[in-house]
């Protein structure tokens, strides 16, 4: 974000007040980004009425973007935020470090997530495997925070977790190397809304599983999956929202209409409340409709896998389905973003602005929990390495808990 020299700021403030002349255009170079933020907030911000008056913010328009935003947003607002517009290159890999020797400074990284189209995905790295070495060098306390920070290509030594327990009950843990993975350099890649899905059999139940990281009204994978699940006789669905952070309200409507009981179709899913300026261009409510080209699965219950990363519209989906069907949460507490947001991009300033614009309530007028939803069945995602398995594996920690719950 920008920095403004102190002396220059003093000169500008003096000139702004000189001769009663409007000199704002002359200083747009220094204030334009914050004026853009201000203009959006005064039109769309949920708490627009509580914003300081324009004349009270004269000095603040010359501040950094973050400083300006903290000055004008409502104190209860923990969601409105700024980010760089540029997509950042990535390996598409998440991991959790663990010390694997009590006597030596040896660590390994347990892979917890892999994006399919990423360098990690292309290298064939799977969730639940372990990174033991990078280019032949071990992971230690000294390099544990930097061993994959340079963004370059590397040759990873991959391992598998193994436990042995002797007759006296003493457990020994091994990470056994089994393959090399050529990890390409960080890059910008296309993310997939629904990266993993499958159909499982659990007792007399046909279970449809889908890892849904984002849903929009244009998420075609949801439509095709609904038809696949219907054709294969799926009568239970496990919806994995552990990594769902950036969905849309029309996507919520589509997914809810696929999952809900047929008796709920035509009923209100969600109601919106905007600021006092009202916005006729935005919908005031969303209705459960028979999805165009998709199948309604007519489910009485949906099992939702959650984590601390589950946020925003994903939480509204949980909340707005509850009046219509049984929603069983398994995993961890969700983040707790109880408002709807809009994202605005500005290429001139290289900024992406995520702005709270509405209160969302379910059909009974109930808002999502500001502190997040606590799970009905609390399960740690990674505490048992033997259950950190590829998504959709029946032995994976959260999915196995969901199957146990639906068959008990």
Regions found by a protein language model. Give the residues of each.
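C-terminal, low-ordered peptide segments at domain boundaries
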Residues: 135-234
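C-terminal "post-core" interaction segments
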Residues: 210, 217, 222-224, 229, ...
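Extracytoplasmic
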Residues: 88-92, 106-108, 126, 151-153, ...
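PDZ/PDZ-like domain segments forming the peptide/carboxylate-binding groove
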Residues: 87-133, 137-140, 216-220
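Extended, small/polar residue-biased N-terminal targeting/export presequences
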Residues: 27-109, 153, 160-194
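Bacterial Sec-dependent N-terminal signal peptides
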Residues: 1-36, 44, 52
């Amino acid at each position: 974000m920008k920095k403004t020299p102190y002396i220059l700021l003093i000169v500008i403030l003096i000139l702004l007040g000189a001769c009663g002349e409007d000199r704002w255009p002359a200083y747009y170079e220094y204030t334009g980004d914050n004026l853009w933020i201000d203009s959006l907030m005064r039109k769309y911000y949920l708490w627009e009425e509580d914003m300081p008056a324009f004349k009270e913010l004269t000095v603040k328009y010359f501040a950094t973007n973050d400083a300006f935003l903290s000055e004008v947003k409502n104190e209860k607002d923990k969601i409105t935020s700024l980010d760089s517009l540029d997509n950042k290159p990535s390996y598409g890999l998440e991991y959790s470090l663990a010390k694997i020797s009590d006597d030596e400074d040896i660590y390994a990284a347990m892979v917890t997530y892999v994006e399919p189209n990423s360098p990690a995905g292309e290298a064939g790295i799977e969730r639940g495997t372990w990174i033991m070495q990078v280019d032949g060098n071990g992971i230690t306390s000294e390099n544990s925070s930097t061993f994959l920070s340079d963004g370059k290509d590397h040759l990873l030594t991959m391992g598998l977790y193994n436990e042995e327990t002797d007759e006296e009950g003493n457990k020994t843990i091994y990470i056994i190397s089994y393959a090399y993975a050529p990890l390409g350099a960080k890059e910008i890649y296309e993310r997939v809304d629904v990266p993993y899905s499958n159909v499982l059999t659990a007792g007399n139940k046909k279970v449809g599983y889908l890892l849904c990281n984002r849903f929009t009204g244009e998420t075609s994978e949801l439509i095709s999956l609904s038809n696949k699940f219907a054709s294969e006789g799926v009568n239970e669905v496990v919806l994995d929202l552990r990594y769902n952070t950036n969905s849309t309200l029309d996507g919520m409507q589509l997914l809810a209409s696929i999952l809900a009981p047929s008796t709920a179709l035509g009923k209100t899913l969600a109601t919106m409340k905007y600021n006092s300026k009202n916005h006729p261009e935005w919908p005031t409510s969303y209705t459960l409709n028979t999805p165009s080209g998709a199948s309604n699965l007519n489910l009485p219950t949906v099992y939702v896998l959650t984590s601390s990363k589950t946020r925003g519209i994903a939480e509204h989906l949980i909340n707005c389905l509850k009046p219509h069907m049984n929603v069983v949460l398994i995993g961890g507490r969700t983040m707790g973003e109880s408002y709807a947001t809009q994202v605005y991009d500005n290429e001139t300033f290289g900024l992406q602005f995520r702005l709270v614009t509405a209160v969302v309530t379910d059909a009974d007028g109930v808002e999502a929990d500001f502190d997040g939803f606590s799970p009905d069945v609390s399960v740690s995602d990674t505490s048992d390495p033997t259950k950190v398995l590829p998504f959709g594996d029946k032995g994976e920690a959260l999915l196995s808990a969901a199957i146990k719950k639906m068959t008990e």
